[in-house]
Amino acid sequence: MEININCDLGEKSKFHSVKNDPKLLNIVNSANIACGYHAGDEPTMDMIIKISKKNGVSIGAHPSFNDPENFGRKRINLNNSEIKKLIFEQYEILQAIAQKNNEDVTHIKPHGALNNMAC
């Protein structure tokens, strides 16, 4: 049996540091990378993608509501098409950075309130 160890990374914000992310990328199989709406920024996404590539870690988008003040934990009432657009925008941001590194986003794992709504 193969087990996929997965971790949310790149969540640079006033709430979190990314100083341990490089160490975590030595032990995980897949990384959910914050896409800038609740946390993270493009330089951080690029750094995590580069280290993931080096370590053979698959890259996933970790989209959220545009809610940095609450770290994406506050529910925002959007209709289904607005939620799809929100997720796709963040996927596209991460995918563009991944492609610059000759990588692809392989999965999407929602964050915070968005993930709670998906459950």
Task: Name what the model sees in each region.
Residues 8-12, 34-38, 64-68, 111-113:
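Active-site beta-loop-alpha junctions enriched in small/polar residues
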Residues 3-7, 31-33, 59-63, 106-110:
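Hydrophobic faces of well-ordered beta-strands that scaffold small-molecule active sites
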Residues 57-77, 109-114:
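Short, charge-patterned binding micro-sites
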Residues 68-101, 107:
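Glycine/small-residue-rich loop that forms an oxyanion/phosphate-binding "nest" at active or ligand-binding sites
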Residues 99-119:
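Hydrophobic, well-structured mid-protein blocks that either form specific transmembrane helices
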Residues 13-46:
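A short alpha/beta connector and helix-capping loop motif
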Residues 3-17:
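N-terminal basic/disordered segments at the start of proteins
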Residues 22-26, 47-60, 99-101:
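Acidic (Asp/Glu)-rich catalytic clusters
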